[in-house]
Amino acid sequence: MSIASVASVFKGEHAVGSKVTVRGWVRTRRDSKAGISFLAVYDGSCFNPIQGVVPNSLDNYDNEVLKLTAGCSVVMTGDVVESPGAGQAFELQVTDIEVAGWVDDPDTYPMAAKRHSIEHLRELAHLRPRTNIIGAVARVRNCLSQAIHRFYHEEGFIWVSTPLITASDCEGAGEMFRVSTLDMENLPRTDAGKVDYDKDFFGKEAFLTVSGQLNAETYACALSKVYTFGPTFRAENSNTSRHLAEFWMVEPEVAFANLNDIAGLAEAMLKYAFNAVLTERMDDLTFFAQHVDKTVIDRLQSFVSSDFAQVDYTDAVEILQNCGRTFEFPVSWGIDLSSEHERYLAEEHFKAPVVVKNYPKDIKAFYMRLNDDGKTVAAMDVLAPGIGEIIGGSQREERLDVLDMRLAEMDLNQEDYWWYRDMRRYGTVPHAGFGLGFERLVSYVTGVNNIRDVIPFPRAPRTANF
């Protein structure tokens, strides 16, 4: 007898007639007049539960099996048999069942068999992974995460753990969470009446990071190819389906690389990750196609078989101005493209993923390399049909004099970036990288539109439960 996951039984890894033990939670129980109960038991290893056929000859049939309800946990031992029922290849002829945990009051169990709205499930984030939709999201999220790590490992990248607590603002945006151990009821003050951060834990102002990019650049300038994969934080007071206060980012940095190199890397990474999901998680994708977004499988298959289009920002603006479409936000050179503009380009004009390159410098960050025209920077966005921007990246400014000029233009203090400037003083090198918002990727793959539903415990304005 061996411990078996439900997935391993369905994959045929246990011979018919072999005895296995499956451990999981009851989804449903159905009793027949012939004295047999049918238990649907799931363990999270795959989408479908396994059916356990439980005879009334078991000693605990009357006093335990017939009292099982949704959510009870069980340890079920039996023989693997081919299933006569539709939709599953194998089931378990149960010879022993142990109840590991009961549901106190089945009538008030929040995850009973009835269907809940996804909005309601957000209020029950500790229980929602027991539902079909959130369980499927979790498996797809894991698959994408593992695929991204595999991709970079196979490409010779080194994973770098960048700090979550920082004193620098990568984006120059100012929307950062402050980290402090000062007594909020009795803040120390300077002679000028300002908060005296010299008395704080780090002896200066500190924040939760908005990006690991600047730190990753320092390692790329020594190890050639690196990436980060971890949480980032934005104190942006936005209550929308596209914003989180805490989310995960994938950020590769490559030395001796230009914008075209990094665009090719982005395309290869996305296709690798999507192929992994199509190969490994078709059971979950089928559920999403049936119940969430019928286009998810076709969209991923189309994505991996498409060549990415490329267009300069200036040409993209001209396309949008001449397309005959009236947009909610009018298009002119110098604006940051909105979601409606991005989706038109990807879905209607190019009908494929598209890389928009060379944006106006005034709408981009200080670290992006200034182009020879003096007006644009070597920045890119990858736009995907169905969602718009999914990746943003750039060639980094490796020239110290130009970097200093950009810092001054954006009223950023050179002294705060002394270590970042050092990289341009000691063996500077052209380099490039991008950032991928991981939750946006999971949302795109699953069709689950609100990114609060693709991260286990969402953090948003006035939302920090659990």
UniProtKB/Swiss-Prot annotation:
Q: Which PROSITE patterns match?
A: AA_TRNA_LIGASE_II
| Keywords linked to the UniProt accession | Aminoacyl-tRNA synthetase, ATP-binding, Cytoplasm, Ligase, Nucleotide-binding, Protein biosynthesis
Instruction: Please provide the Gene Ontology terms (biological process) for this protein.
Output: asparaginyl-tRNA aminoacylation
Q: Which domain of life is it from?
A: Bacteria
> Where is this protein localized, as stated in its record?
Cytoplasm
Q: What SUPFAM superfamilies does the record point to?
A: Class II aaRS and biotin synthetases, Nucleic acid-binding proteins
Write out the catalysed reaction: tRNA(Asn) + L-asparagine + ATP = L-asparaginyl-tRNA(Asn) + AMP + diphosphate + H(+)
**Family named by the database record:** Belongs to the class-II aminoacyl-tRNA synthetase family.
Oligomer and partners: Homodimer.
Q: What is this protein called?
A: Asparagine--tRNA ligase
Q: Which organism is it from?
A: Shewanella baltica (strain OS155 / ATCC BAA-1091)
Its taxonomic path starts at: Bacteria, Pseudomonadati, Pseudomonadota, Gammaproteobacteria, Alteromonadales
